[in-house]
Amino acid sequence: MFGWAITFLVIAIAAGIFGFAGLAGTAAWIAKVLFVVGLAAVLIMLVMGRRPPTV
């Protein structure tokens, strides 16, 4: 998930350099969304992994 976010961030930067404003904005938005979703998934996995063992 973070790999995809970095990929779209690089696409956004490259598009911004070459002047494709619409594409840069869209790619940056996708990168932000994927980063937040990935971060939420990591936090959920950290919380779920700390359950006490059931006897």
From Swiss-Prot:
Presence of keyword Transmembrane: yes
Superkingdom of the source species: Bacteria
Membrane-topology descriptor: Multi-pass membrane protein
One family name in Pfam for this protein: DUF1328
Record-linked InterPro entries: DUF1328
Keywords: Cell membrane, Membrane, Transmembrane, Transmembrane helix
GO CC terms: plasma membrane
Subcellular localization(s) per the UniProt record: Cell membrane
Transmembrane segments: 1-21, 28-48
Family: Belongs to the UPF0391 family.
NCBIfam families in the record: PRK13682.1-4 (NF010229)
Name of the protein: UPF0391 membrane protein Tbd_2772
Organism, as annotated: Thiobacillus denitrificans (strain ATCC 25259 / T1)
